[in-house]
């Protein structure tokens, strides 16, 4: 199966800071990771968007 591109958006400001590749098979939940947001200048929760 092919990989699809997705981005990780900051939960606080909504800025899309990171891009990742995910499998194309459907999954019930989306990825949530604590990463550094350049806009907020702190570590925040980032959620997967497509």
Curated annotation (Swiss-Prot):
InterPro entries: Ribosomal_bL33 (IPR001705), Ribosomal_bL33_sf (IPR038584), Ribosomal_zn-bd (IPR011332). GO terms for molecular function: structural constituent of ribosome. The keyword Nucleotidyltransferase does not apply. GO terms for biological process: translation. It holds the Pfam family Ribosomal_L33. Keywords: Ribonucleoprotein, Ribosomal protein. One of its GO terms (cellular component) is ribosome. Belongs to the bacterial ribosomal protein bL33 family. This is Large ribosomal subunit protein bL33A. It comes from Streptococcus thermophilus (strain ATCC BAA-250 / LMG 18311).
């Amino acid at each position: 199966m092919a990989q699809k591109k997705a981005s990780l958006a900051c939960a606080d400001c909504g800025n899309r800071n990171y891009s990742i590749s995910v499998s194309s098979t459907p999954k019930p939940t989306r990825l949530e990771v604590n990463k550094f947001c350049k806009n907020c200048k702190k570590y925040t929760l980032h959620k997967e968007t497509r």
